[in-house]
Each structure stands twice: as structure tokens, then as C-alpha cells.
């Protein structure tokens, strides 16, 4: 908010007495999520007083939660990147989620997201303003936004890369090694530039126990020229996001 970026009202819940205060302040429906967490794990959507009572019954009473107004938009995008020791952004990119993290958790969908070749200027302006306001140095950042028409609403700011294998997705999209780039930055060396035009990079998952119209072999044969790598998801992410992650690149939005 201090950065001049649209946000939804929210409140931190540390004790049971804070719950009713937060509900009264923000109003239903709202989202309750751990103040320190990844994705939509342990997240609750509270629409009715009964939902609030259910949260009270399920909550361990110790984990701090953040309550925020529910936004109806189903479009979530990011402003991600890396800042150097002076706080200057040396790398930035953006990706769109095919499904919201909350829908992934509620409906056990297959996780899919894609890095874009170009970034909307307003999203870039908002993201850069947020990074400047936090004043972090020599860190990755991962900022999520709801897209509302031609505007954006900031959801959360993280002093880390996006989860899972997302750095690998960035690398395939931008044709360089962000791991080496970060090491160079920490060592005081110049951050390397990519010599190639960015590509779209799709990361999409499959579940081991789900039935699909096409087998893995058929999918990989169909997209053999776009396919880059298959990763086995760590157990911590598999239940929420799927067991296997596939990365594919293309220069064409239509093909994506």
C-alpha cells in the first residue's frame, strides 16, 4: 500500500480473540492463510459464520494467520526476479497461473503455469515499486497479483523465488543459468545477460494415479520439439501440485 499499489484489506490473527475482530473489520467472504507458508497449503475460504466456526475448530491456536478480503478474480500473475547488493533489480520476469493456488488445493487440479515473453508495463511498475518499498538486497523476490481487467491487486510478497522447479522454468524461458547468475552476484561479479530472445515456457504437471486422454508417451511424442525436461515433484509439493512436472518452450503464444 505504501508503494502505491492496490491491495485488499487484511489483518494478522495471532490469537482466537483476533478472529472475530478480523472478520468484523474485513467482512465475509475472506481468505485465511498462514502468515508464513507456500502456495495455498492450510488455506481456508470463509464465506459464512459456520465457516468461521470451522476455522476456529481446525486452527491449532499457534500458527499465525493472515485474513484478507476474498477477490473473485481467477487470474493470478507474478512479478519475479532478483536484486543485487544495492537493491537494484538485475533480473525480472512474469508468469501466469492456469489455476489459482486455492483451486489447486480445493479441487486437486494439475498445476500449470507459463512464463511470458513480455511483461505488461503496469505490472512492471507495480512490481518495481513494491521491491523498492521493501528495500531488500541480494535476494530473490516473488510477488503475486490478481489481474482485474487492465489493473492488478497485490496478493503477497515473498523474499524467495517461486516454489518447486520455477527457477528452471525461468532458465528455459530466458536461455540462461539463473543459479550461476545468482552466484556471480553474491561473489561481486557482473550479473550475466542472456544472449537470446525470451521464449514462452510452460510448466505443467501430471498425477501418477490419474487417468488422462493421452499417455505420457503420446504427449511427449506430440510435443517432442517443444519438450525440455521432466521433473519428479518432491513429496512436499506432490499432493498439491502433481507428481511430475514437464517443461516445454515455444516462441509462439498461439502454440502455447
Question: Over which residues does each language-model region extend?
Answer:
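Short secondary-structure junctions
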Residues: 5, 135-136, 222-225
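Peripheral (often C-terminal) accessory segments that flank ATP-dependent C-N-forming ligase machineries
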Residues: 19, 181-256
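A short, glycine/Asx- and small/polar-enriched loop/turn
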Residues: 26-27, 147-153, 240-242
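Phosphate-binding core of ATP-grasp and ATP-grasp-like enzymes
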Residues: 58-64, 70-113, 121-153, 158-167, ...
Amino acid at each position: 500500500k505504501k508503494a502505491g499499489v492496490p491491495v485488499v484489506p487484511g489483518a494478522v490473527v495471532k490469537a482466537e480473540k483476533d478472529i472475530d475482530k478480523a472478520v468484523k473489520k474485513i467482512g465475509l467472504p475472506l481468505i485465511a492463510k498462514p502468515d508464513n507458508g507456500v502456495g495455498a497449503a492450510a488455506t481456508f475460504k470463509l464465506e459464512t459464520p459456520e465457516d468461521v466456526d470451522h476455522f476456529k475448530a481446525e486452527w491449532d491456536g499457534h500458527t499465525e494467520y493472515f485474513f484478507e478480503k476474498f477477490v473473485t478474480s481467477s487470474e493470478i500473475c507474478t512479478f519475479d526476479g532478483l536484486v543485487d547488493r544495492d537493491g537494484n533489480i538485475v533480473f525480472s520476469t512474469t508468469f501466469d497461473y492456469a489455476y489459482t493456488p486455492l483451486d489447486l488445493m480445493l479441487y486437486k487440479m494439475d498445476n500449470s503455469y507459463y512464463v511470458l515473453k513480455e511483461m505488461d508495463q503496469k505490472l512492471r511498475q507495480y512490481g518495481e515499486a513494491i521491491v523498492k518499498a521493501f528495500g531488500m538486497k541480494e535476494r530473490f523476490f516473488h510477488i503475486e497479483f490478481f489481474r482485474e481487467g487492465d489493473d492488478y491487486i497485490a496478493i503477497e510478497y515473498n523474499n524467495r523465488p517461486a516454489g518447486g522447479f520455477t527457477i528452471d522454468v525461468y532458465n528455459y524461458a530466458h536461455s540462461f543459468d539463473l543459479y550461476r547468475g545468482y552466484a556471480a552476484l553474491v561473489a561481486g561479479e557482473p550479473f550475466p545477460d542472456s544472449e537470446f530472445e525470451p521464449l514462452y515456457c510452460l510448466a505443467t504437471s501430471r498425477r501418477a494415479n490419474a487417468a488422462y486422454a493421452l499417455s505420457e508417451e503420446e504427449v511427449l511424442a506430440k510435443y517432442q520439439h517443444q519438450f525440455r525436461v521432466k521433473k519428479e515433484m518432491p513429496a512436499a509439493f506432490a499432493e498439491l501440485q502433481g507428481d511430475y512436472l514437464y517443461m516445454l518452450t515455444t516462441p509462439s503464444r498461439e502454440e502455447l
